[in-house]
């Protein structure tokens, strides 16, 4: 099985790469987490990246599902004070529970913001 053996030089290069890759994985920091919380929109912009419609035929993700992912998959691995949660879509202001979502994210220690066209703002 001499075909499986590699030379010392290649072995050292692979070990070095492996160490560098592991260090890179350890150093990677999550700074921003985008939640595309709706595909609904009150406009139909041609230039926008998401396929957004007034009624896209897809239900919005329930807040509880997002918070479960945040609690179980994100929070154990980050300092919430160092991560910005960004609500995006579609148009986030079409969600009637957006204020509750923001309050729940804040209660968990995260800062948050949103991407909006602003048409739903009244004050």
Please name every model-derived segment.
Residues 5-123:
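Conserved alpha-helical substructure of the radical SAM core
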């Amino acid at each position: 099985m001499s075909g499986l053996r590699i030379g010392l030089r290649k072995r050292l290069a692979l070990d070095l790469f492996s160490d560098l890759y592991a260090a890179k994985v350890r150093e990677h920091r999550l700074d921003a987490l985008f939640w595309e919380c709706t595909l609904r929109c009150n406009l139909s912009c041609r230039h926008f990246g998401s396929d957004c419609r007034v009624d896209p035929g897809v239900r919005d993700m329930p807040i509880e599902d997002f918070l479960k992912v945040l609690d179980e998959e994100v929070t154990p691995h980050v300092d919430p004070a160092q991560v910005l949660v960004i609500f995006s879509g579609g148009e986030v202001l079409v969600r009637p529970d957006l204020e509750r979502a923001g309050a729940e994210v804040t209660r968990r220690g995260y800062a948050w913001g949103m991407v909006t066209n602003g048409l739903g703002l009244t004050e």
